[in-house]
Amino acid sequence: MPTPNTASPQAKGFRRAVSELDAKQAEAIMSPRFIGRRQSLIEDARKEREKAEAASAASSEPGDLLEAAVSKEKDGKAMLNLLFTLRGAKTSSLSRAVKAFETFEAQIHHLETRPVQRPRAGGPHLEYFVRCEVPSADLPALLSSVRRVAEDVRGAGENKVLWFPRKVSELDKCHHLVTKFDPDLDLDHPGFSDQVYRQRRKLIAEIAFQYKHGDPIPRVEYTAEEIATWKEVYTTLKSLYVTHACREHLEAFQLLERFSGYREDSIPQLEDVSRFLKERTGFQLRPVAGLLSARDFLASLAFRVFQCTQYIRHASSPMHSPEPDCCHELLGHVPMLADRTFAQFSQDIGLASLGASDEEIEKLSTLYWFTVEFGLCKQNGEVKAYGAGLLSSYGELLHSLSEEPEIRAFDPDAAAVQPYQDQTYQSVYFVSESFSDAKDKLRNYASRIQRPFSVKFDPYTLAIDVLDSPHAIRRSLEGVQDELHTLAHALSAIG
C-alpha cells in the first residue's frame, strides 16, 4: 500500500522549494531540457527482448527453422521440437497436422497443448508442442508439410544458456554501446552542433575503446570549460546533500574529498577513485565510452566492476545530461559503492543477471532503476536519497523528497514491473527500510529466477563459479567450511 512521504521534516512542496532558488537555478530545473532524462537500462533491455522475439519470429524461414527445431542428430535420426498453432479450432485441423508426422514415420515422444502466451484477438488460444524423432533426410519435407496445415511454426529447442563472462578479463568483450544519445547522432543532444565538443568526446571515448582489464586507467587532462561545468554541478549538489542524502553517501563523500581528489576546482581521475573503492569494498572502475547495453552493464556488477564514463556533459547544459557522464557517476554512484552493504546489493543484481533471459534482464534493469538509480531509504525517522539518479540531479533530488511524488515500500516483485518515467521526474519512488533489508529482499527475488544453475563470485580469482553439478557445489562448500573454521577459531579466541 502506498505510504505518504511525510518522514522527512525538510520535505516541502516541490514548487515552493524551487521558488526559493535563484532565478537561474529555478529556470534550469523547470525547463524541459533539464527534466528530460537519458535513456535507461530498462529501455535497452526492453529493446533487446523485442529483438529476441523478432529473431524468434524470423526463425520461421526454412533454414533457420531447422536450426532452431533440431536438438540433436545421431545415426540418421533427428530429434525435432516444434511449436505451432492451428488454423481454426476444428478437430480436422489437428488430424491434418498429425497426418503430416505419420507420413514421414515420425516417432512422437511427447505431445501437449499450451496456452498461447500472447493471443491475438480472434486468434487461436492454444499452441501445440511436439517432440518427435524423424529421419534426418525427411526434415525439410516434414517441416514444409506442417507449415501447410499450421500457423506460427517455430523451433522449441532445448533452452540454451546465453553467454556471460566467467572471468573478469572477459569484461573486455562486454562493450556493446547504446548510441541513441550520442552527440554525433542525436539532434537534441546539447553538443550536437558543437564540433569541438564532439571531437573531444571522441578523444575521451578512445580511452575506453583501447582499455583492457588490468591496465591503469589513463588520466584525462580536463579543460578549463569542463572544470567550470564540474564546479557548477559539484557546488550546487553538495549544498543539498547534508539534508537530502543518506548517511552512507555523506560519509563516503567526505572520504573522497580527503583521499581521492574530490573538490570543486578539479575533476577526479578514475584511476585514483578506483583504487579508493577497491580498498573500501573491492569495487573497481572501468572506463566506458557511453551507455552500455543492459546485459553487459549488469554483468560487470557481478565482478564488482562499475563501468564509468570519463567525459562530462556539455557546458550549455550543466544541470542536465541526456546520458550518463562523469558528474552522474562520480557524484551519484561512486560514494554509494564505497558502502559494503550497498556494494553487495549492487553485485547481487549483477549475479542475478548472468545467463538470465531477456525478460528477466528487463525486470532486473527496472529493479536497478528504482533502487540504485532512484532509491530512497529510511534513516532515523526520515526519508533520504541513495539513488545515483537523485544524488546527481538537483531538481529530482528536491522533487523526490517533496510532498508531490508517491512513496511506496520497496517490494522487488512490484518494482520490477513498475512503469518508469524517462521524460520527467518520477511519480513513484520506492523506499527501503535499510540496505540490509533491501539486499535480503533482492536475494529472495533472485532465487526465483529460472536458471539451470546458480552462480557464486570467487573474490580470489575474480571469476564466476557456475554451480551446475554436485562436484561444483562440493568444491564451493569447501571454501565456506574454511571460512567457518576461521570464524569459529576467532570466536573461541575471544571467549
Curated annotation (Swiss-Prot):
Coarse class of the protein's main subcellular location: cytoplasm
This protein's pathway: Catecholamine biosynthesis; dopamine biosynthesis; dopamine from L-tyrosine: step 1/2
Post-translational modification, as annotated: Phosphorylated on Ser-19, Ser-31 and Ser-40 by several protein kinases with different site specificities. Phosphorylation at Ser-31 and Ser-40 leads to an increase of TH activity. Phosphorylation at Ser-40 activates the enzyme and also counteracts the feedback inhibition of TH by catecholamines. Phosphorylation of Ser-19 and Ser-31 triggers the proteasomal degradation of TH through the ubiquitin-proteasome pathway. Phosphorylation at Ser-31 facilitates transport of TH from the soma to the nerve terminals via the microtubule network.
Regulation of its activity: Inhibited in feedback fashion by the catecholamine neurotransmitters, especially by dopamine in competition with tetrahydrobiopterin. Phosphorylation of several Ser/Thr residues in the N-terminus regulates the catalytic activity. Ser-31 and Ser-40 are readily phosphorylated to activate the catalytic activity. A Cysteine modification induced by N-ethylmaleimide (NEM), inhibits tyrosine 3-monooxygenase activity through the modification of the Cys-174.
Top-rank taxon: Eukaryota
Function: Catalyzes the conversion of L-tyrosine to L-dihydroxyphenylalanine (L-Dopa), the rate-limiting step in the biosynthesis of cathecolamines, dopamine, noradrenaline, and adrenaline. Uses tetrahydrobiopterin and molecular oxygen to convert tyrosine to L-Dopa. In addition to tyrosine, is able to catalyze the hydroxylation of phenylalanine and tryptophan with lower specificity. Positively regulates the regression of retinal hyaloid vessels during postnatal development.
Name of the protein in its database record: Tyrosine 3-monooxygenase
